[in-house]
Amino acid sequence: MLGLKGLVGTLCWLAIPTLALAGSTSDNQGVAGLCLLIGIVVSVPVFALLPFVQSHFATDGKLKRFFQPLQVMRLFSRAPMAHLFSLFLILVLALPLFLLKVEQVPREFLWTLSLLFIAFAWPSRMLAGWASGRGARKEKPVRWWLRYPIQFFAAPISFLFAVIFYLTRYISWNGTLSLLENHVFLLPAPFWLGG
């Protein structure tokens, strides 16, 4: 039941940016451009917060934790460097895994790729928990003159990842459908929709 709650909460966060990015394949250039703009703009805060929202949910398994982003932002303000460091590593560790989606792998070899996906995803989850734990142990936020510049850098990191995430549909054998196989936030598996 915990996994189902996590999936539902994560899908709520990813629905708008993912569907908007998928909508950017429209034949109408105006609609496609608008969808791309909406998808990228909405993806930036989603990608910056979602790993920590998932970590917040994992503390007690209550679905309502997915809808408390202010709690996560408070934790971020108490340990901004830990959150920025872990966000960077979470998104960087996800990048090489996109290359494994270039060509469809025979079904009998999928388990080997799944092990690789889990090996990259597990440290990411641990980093998110570590950063959230550091924020939870501190009483007060870091001084604003230090906190705001650090928090500012989360946006370009997430923006760059959102652009790369969007472009991966051009190298994935699954095309636009690969946007729904977001191994960073959903199942750490290579081809769970079309495999």
Label every model-predicted segment:
Residues 11-25, 86-108, 161-179:
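Alpha-helical transmembrane segments and their membrane-interface junctions
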Residues 26-66, 99-146:
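Selective recognition of hydrophobic, aromatic-rich stretches within alpha-helical transmembrane segments
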Residues 16, 114, 125, 147-148, ...:
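Enriched - but not universal
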Residues 133-194:
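Cytosolic/matrix-facing juxtamembrane and C-terminal tails of multi-pass cellular membrane proteins
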Residues 1-37:
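Long, highly hydrophobic alpha-helical transmembrane signal-anchor segments
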Residues 6-10, 40-43, 159-162:
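Membrane-embedded alpha-helical bundles that form the substrate/pore pathway
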